[in-house]
Amino acid sequence: MKTFSPKPEHISHQWFLVDAHNKILGRLAAQIAHRLRGKHKPEFAPHIDNGDYIVVVNCEQIKVTGNKQEQKKYYRHSGYVGGLKETTLKTLLEKKPAEVLIHAVRGMLPKNRLGRAMLKKLKVYAGPEHQHIAQQPIPLSLPY
């Protein structure tokens, strides 16, 4: 019996809409990464990008457990000596709420060219409106 490898004509990408209102950040990111990779499909192959497009709205109302609002830190470097900058989750949620979810999902995807292509299929918006009405995304209710 030969191993099945999906061909381009077998691959279909659907659009899904996820509401992040009162969802927990890590659990939501894990489920989104699972769908972006295409692991929910029976024709999954690790070397092919057959995942779906995910549109996430209400990202500003995302929740975290414990004291992560004040204790979790995000680091970035300016490229100069002594240029390590740090921000807390609370300040990042106030300034750029979409970046919090993108950063969490990016850490759960492969760190290669395929992972970068999968991340481009994630569309995150802070408020309830999005600009992908023409794609007719299907509302997706995630279990937790």
UniProtKB/Swiss-Prot annotation:
GO biological process, one term: negative regulation of translation
Name of the protein in question: Large ribosomal subunit protein uL13
CDD domains according to UniProt: Ribosomal_L13
Stored SUPFAM superfamilies: Ribosomal protein L13
This protein's GO CC annotations: cytosolic large ribosomal subunit
Keyword terms, alphabetized: Ribonucleoprotein, Ribosomal protein
Record-stated family: Belongs to the universal ribosomal protein uL13 family.
Disulfide bond entries: none
A Pfam match: Ribosomal_L13
Gene name, Swiss-Prot/TrEMBL: rplM
Summary of the function given for this chain in its UniProt record: This protein is one of the early assembly proteins of the 50S ribosomal subunit, although it is not seen to bind rRNA by itself. It is important during the early stages of 50S assembly.
